[in-house]
């Protein structure tokens, strides 16, 4: 999930969906809380059954939406970046990432985790391209919902959604956000700046934004 600090500074960068396992009797809040906890911990040794389940789900998504291909992770490089052993890198970065081929496509990314799937699409598209992007998202979600029993949570609508029934509402929110982000009058940036001021107080700026690394 996009963290709060990032959202405050930059605004949301993508429209996100989370496909979660909702057991009988669990509320949506319970499921979301468990999802956040799962993201914050090292889940321990790899479970072969879980790894096989993820591979099968990723394959089902590829079959439903053939434009997606798995990203091949270089665990040696990941271990170097994380300053850890390769075995630990494999354990911590155990998700399967699917991207559109050839890139960039619509920029949709699918991440298959142990007990959930995340689907994101950047705020790039309007009109026919936006419609097509959400059609692809529906294709991605179908096997996860029908074959694996996952429920779809839409943080933008703040509720569980059903596809394709909720696609028009989702696309309307998406295109409104695209319009706000690309507003030539800068209202989105002004609103983001005001939100930062409310959260942190006014912070004196000593460098231009592009000099942040100095």
Model-found features: residue ranges?
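Acidic (Asp/Glu-rich) sequence patches and key acidic residues
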Residues: 7-214
């Amino acid at each position: 999930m996009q963290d709060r600090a990032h959202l405050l500074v930059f605004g949301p960068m993508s429209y996100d969906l989370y496909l979660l396992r909702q057991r009988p009797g669990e509320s949506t809040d319970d499921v979301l809380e468990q999802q956040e906890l799962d993201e914050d911990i090292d889940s321990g040794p790899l479970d072969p059954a879980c790894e096989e389940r993820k591979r099968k789900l990723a394959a089902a998504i590829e079959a439903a939406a053939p434009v997606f291909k798995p990203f091949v992770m270089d665990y040696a490089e990941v271990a170097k970046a994380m300053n850890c052993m390769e075995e630990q890198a494999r354990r911590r970065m155990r998700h399967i990432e699917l991207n559109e081929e050839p890139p960039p496509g619509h920029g949709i990314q699918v991440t298959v985790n142990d007990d959930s799937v995340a689907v994101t699409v950047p705020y790039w598209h309007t009109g026919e391209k936006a419609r097509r992007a959400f059609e692809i998202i529906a294709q991605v979600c179908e096997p996860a919902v029908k074959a694996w029993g996952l429920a779809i949570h839409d943080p933008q609508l703040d509720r569980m959604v059903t596809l394709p029934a909720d696609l028009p509402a989702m696309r309307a929110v998406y295109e409104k956000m695209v319009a706000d982000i690309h507003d030539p009058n800068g209202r989105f940036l002004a609103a983001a700046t005001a939100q930062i001021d409310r959260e942190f107080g006014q912070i004196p700026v000593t460098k231009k934004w592009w000099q942040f690394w100095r």
